[in-house]
Amino acid sequence: RDGNQALIDPMDPERKLRMFKTLVRMGFKEIEVGFPSASQPDFDFVRHIIEHDLIPDDVTIQVLVQSRPELIRRTYESIRGAKQAIVHFYNSVNPLQRRVVFGLDQAGVTKIAVDAATLCRSLEPTVAGTRVRYEYSPESFTLAEPEFAVAICEAVMDVIEPTPTN
């Protein structure tokens, strides 16, 4: 997650805004601004910086989301109106979580990732005017079979169709 939820004293919106503005002043061009589907404050923060035109033209915001359809849809609602955004989606891929959490094999977990990528692509028209890029993370991949970690990323790339500039 963006780490804010793990803090003993999570940042309030004003503090997050100070942090965002500081990162912009420092010259960062890609800034993760939250996990808008995980909490209303994160959603509201993303909407605030978009609606108040606080994102410089040369800065891309990034939002984090689990590979779950309802959360992906909510995330796209949050970025509507941004000039550019990176949607960073993820799902766990290690054998223990595949078995215990999802009750799925490699094919089933790959389907979660591919379905998420497909949904993301299908939602692009809902944020017309926003240049959307993607980041996919196979969460806990270091505990997964290396061949599987590579294969699931390749399956996602087949949907996302990355280019050198996107």
Located regions from the model:
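Alpha/beta enzyme core
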Residues: D2, A6-I31, V46-P56, P69-N166
